[in-house]
Amino acid sequence: MLKREMNIADYDAELWQAMEQEKVRQEEHIELIASENYTSPRVMQAQGSQLTNKYAEGYPGKRYYGGCEYVDIVEQLAIDRAKELFGADYANVQPHSGSQANFAVYTALLEPGDTVLGMNLAHGGHLTHGSPVNFSGKLYNIVPYGIDATGHIDYADLEKQAKEHKPKMIIGGFSAYSGVVDWAKMREIADSIGAYLFVDMAHVAGLVAAGVYPNPVPHAHVVTTTTHKTLAGPRGGLILAKGGSEELYKKLNSAVFPGGQGGPLMHVIAGKAVALKEAMEPEFKTYQQQVAKNAKAMVEVFLERGYKVVSGGTDNHLFLVDLVDKNLTGKEADAALGRANITVNKNSVPNDPKSPFVTSGIRVGTPAITRRGFKEAEAKELAGWMCDVLDSINDEAVIERIKGKVLDICARYPVYA
């Protein structure tokens, strides 16, 4: 018989210690990785629930197992909330990740070998948008598009590539682009050649939900997102659409199950339902507005301190700092900031002379610090500290001084109070 008082600490001290150390790390480090965020205790409660015990292959009302009457309610709540939040008339909440949601879209809309137009990874795209090491690059004929000299999407080149290569699908979306995408323009280009427009809004879904960033759902044939990142829910994926045919929606459902997955993770779907409800609250909109304000505030300081920011600014939650002129690599910057308890990720910049394992830039995002309660003043102070470290990358005294400031501000703004 299982007893509810069973716990990891008493049973597996080695594992528990690592878990506790990670908890301390999150509280004592400033998190600036653009794809990371802190989810609410309500979401974690759902993920740690007995829903983890239930197999539920199929969809609500059409399961392959019995005993699904309550998990049907859970999944339907998540579906309905996703549709309401993003103005969609179709939602699939089962994908285990954003990449698996993207895989489902590819398999629903395309045949292996079909031509796809996707954003160049080196210009801000994502692995699943056509990287040769990913399924997308291995199974499909990928034609990349990118940004112009100003750091913004080159729509003229995109249109030229589309007319020349006649892709079956055009992908909008990014993992390291700080501008606003013109979804209507992308749909116009897709329609001109009879292609699908598929948008991966994983990075900006929270901003979209709050009305801070344009919603791609009215423009795209299909939209995917993760449920973490700016949306601040559990790690998982989501597929959305509006105005599509029943045939399209059946194809998408079949591409998720049984096409790419078996049983859904019902405890995660419950977490998604909680997060989607939280995203409808007025304070969520305030939070997302602050995310964007904090990113702009940080950019201002980097520019004042003589650092180059790709595209010269940001209109969302992230920005790229180009370190080529500073004779620094992203790897060096990442490591030095890490020693000061500031977590970023090294990132390739446009026309990067370094390999993806070294890079010439860092990506900075504000969802996590804003979740802690940082506003513009704290964001600017933090950006100044980062510049101090990068200006003196081999000076351990400077790094230790900044680390002390980081520990102090983390104590004042805990993740979980």
From Swiss-Prot:
Residues carrying N6-(pyridoxal phosphate)lysine: 229
Residue numbers binding glycine: 35, 65, 363
Coiled coil location: none
Enzyme Commission code(s) on record: 2.1.2.1
InterPro entries xrefs: PyrdxlP-dep_Trfase (IPR015424), PyrdxlP-dep_Trfase_major (IPR015421), PyrdxlP-dep_Trfase_small (IPR015422), Ser_HO-MeTrfase (IPR001085), Ser_HO-MeTrfase-like (IPR049943), Ser_HO-MeTrfase_PLP_BS (IPR019798), SHMT-like_dom (IPR039429)
Keyword Magnesium belongs to the record: no
Phenotype upon changing residue 264 to G: Important decrease in affinity and catalytic efficiency
Expression induction or repression: By CsgD.
Amino acids binding (6S)-5,6,7,8-tetrahydrofolate: 121, 125-127, 246, 355-357
Pathway: One-carbon metabolism; tetrahydrofolate interconversion; Amino-acid biosynthesis; glycine biosynthesis; glycine from L-serine: step 1/1
Catalytic activity: (6R)-5,10-methylene-5,6,7,8-tetrahydrofolate + glycine + H2O = (6S)-5,6,7,8-tetrahydrofolate + L-serine; L-allo-threonine = acetaldehyde + glycine; (6R)-5,10-methenyltetrahydrofolate + H2O = (6S)-5-formyl-5,6,7,8-tetrahydrofolate + H(+)
Modified residues (N6-acetyllysine): 54, 250, 285, 354, 375
Record-listed pyridoxal 5'-phosphate binding positions: 55, 99, 175, 203, 228, 235, 263
Cofactor: pyridoxal 5'-phosphate
Annotated GO biological process: glycine biosynthetic process from serine; glycine catabolic process; L-serine biosynthetic process; L-serine catabolic process; tetrahydrofolate interconversion; tetrahydrofolate metabolic process
Keyword Transport: no
Name of the featured protein: Serine hydroxymethyltransferase
Organism: Escherichia coli (strain K12)
Taxonomic placement: Bacteria, Pseudomonadati, Pseudomonadota, Gammaproteobacteria, Enterobacterales
Gene that encodes the chain: glyA
